[in-house]
Design a protein with these regions (language model features):
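A short Gly-Trp-Pro
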Residues: 7-9, 14-15, 19-148
Length: 148
């Protein structure tokens, strides 16, 4: 995965998810905290440096806080200085969805959980090798689920 791949996927290239989690908005509202619902379903953004997850680098996996799909591994996590947890790549093809985002007068690539469509954050082309990508994620959209 590189920036050209992320743009192609955001423009509609095929990116099949491993499965789907289809719930009503009422079910999501009941399952998520108010902050999670605001970020994950309404595409909000948590404040930078609001979570200790930014400085958590213990081995393990990070999953979608909505559906539990494993999205990132701590091996690809890095300190970006942005105030949000940042990763260089997802754990597998198809787990992250990519969408063009022109909100707030900007052109960005939104990252979503490809299983439940939860807003995770954005992807930028300024990350470390080998991908050169920075997956800048909202911590409330993730949960640490397993230690290596």
């Amino acid at each position: 995965m590189n920036w050209a791949d992320a743009i192609a996927l955001a423009k509609g290239a095929e990116n099949p998810p491993p499965r789907r989690d289809e719930r009503s908005e009422a079910e999501w509202r009941a399952a998520l905290s108010p902050e999670q619902y605001q970020v994950m379903r309404l595409k909000g953004t948590e404040r930078p440096f609001a979570s200790e997850m930014c400085s958590l680098f213990k081995p393990g996996q990070y999953a979608c806080a909505g559906c539990g799909t494993e999205l990132f591994d701590s091996a690809s996590k890095f300190e970006s200085g942005t105030g949000w947890p940042s990763f260089g790549e997802p754990v597998a093809d198809g787990v992250v969805g990519y969408h063009l985002d022109t909100s707030h007068g900007m052109q960005r690539v939104e990252a979503t959980c490809n299983v439940c469509d939860a807003h995770l954050g954005h992807v930028f082309p300024d990350g470390p090798a080998p991908s050169g990508l920075r997956y800048c994620m909202n911590a409330v959209s993730l949960e640490k689920v397993a230690d290596a």
